[in-house]
Regions:
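N-terminal low-complexity segments that are often proline-rich with Ser/Thr-Pro
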Residues: 194-216
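A broadly conserved detector of short glycine/acidic/proline-rich loop/turn motifs that flank catalytic sites
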Residues: 6, 39, 137
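Glycine-rich phosphate/pyrophosphate-binding loop
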Residues: 1-5, 217
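Conserved catalytic cores of soluble enzyme domains
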Residues: 63, 71, 75-196
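A structural preference for short, pocket-lining loop segments at secondary-structure junctions
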Residues: 1-2, 16-61, 68-87, 109-113
Length: 217
């Protein structure tokens, strides 16, 4: 499993490097990868202090490298050869939600606040969140059904432009931030157990296993 250990579990250069290394090791040595953080927040996104300092010092190459590195890291998880599951809780904002977008499945705490909020500080999502928020909404469309894709693009743009935040895991599902099949845990103490069930039982594909355990069946 992977656990962030930065302040508020924020994203910085060391975390980005760790994500790449964790994906490689998971593919080499394990059957699945689990992202389970500790502390008050799951992940509040990028370390804005580091971003501001780099900008003030005009370290444009370093900023460019960090943005590209996190984009690649989330996509690296998305296309990993082993299933990746995240256990978001509390604040799962900006890069925290982008991290979830890179996962095959989510076992979220009911009290999860999720959204791409970068526009609030004058930025746009930098970790492939713009792409993956749209992709996640399109995933819910049944195969073969004709749709107006522009409507999905417009809604994604609104979600990002208004920094829309879901105030619960269920609302995150309703907004299309999480999949309908993603799990929700009322008790964080059970979250890790349910996470393991999802990772082992059919490598993320057995959503029924999560449902049975969450309802005590």
């Amino acid at each position: 499993g992977l656990t962030l250990r930065t302040k508020a579990n924020s994203i910085d250069a060391d975390v980005i490097k760790m994500l790449h290394e964790a994906a490689e090791r998971a593919e080499r040595d394990f059957r699945a990868m689990v992202i389970y953080n500790q502390g008050e927040f799951f992940c509040v996104g990028a370390n804005l202090f580091a971003v501001v300092m780099a900008a003030q010092q005009k370290q444009w190459d370093g900023l460019r490298e960090m943005i590209h590195g996190y984009q690649y890291a989330t996509q690296r998880l998305k296309y990993a050869k082993v299933p990746v599951i995240a256990a978001p809780y509390n604040m799962t904002l900006g890069g925290g939600l982008e991290l979830c977008y890179g996962c095959d499945g989510v076992q979220a705490a009911l009290e999860t606040y999720a959204g791409l909020v970068e526009v609030g500080v004058g930025l746009i999502p930098g970790g492939a969140g713009t792409l993956n928020m749209l992709w996640r909404s399109l995933e819910a469309v049944p195969e073969g059904v004709e749709i107006d894709t522009q409507a999905f693009v417009v809604q994604t743009f609104k979600n990002i432009a208004l920094a829309k935040v879901a105030t619960s895991a269920d609302e995150a599902k309703a907004f299309g931030f999480f999949r309908p099949t993603d799990g929700v845990s009322f008790d964080r103490a059970r979250q890790l157990h349910l996470l393991a069930v999802g990772a082992i039982g059919e490598q993320v594909g057995d959503d029924a296993a999560l449902d049975r355990h969450d309802h005590g069946l």
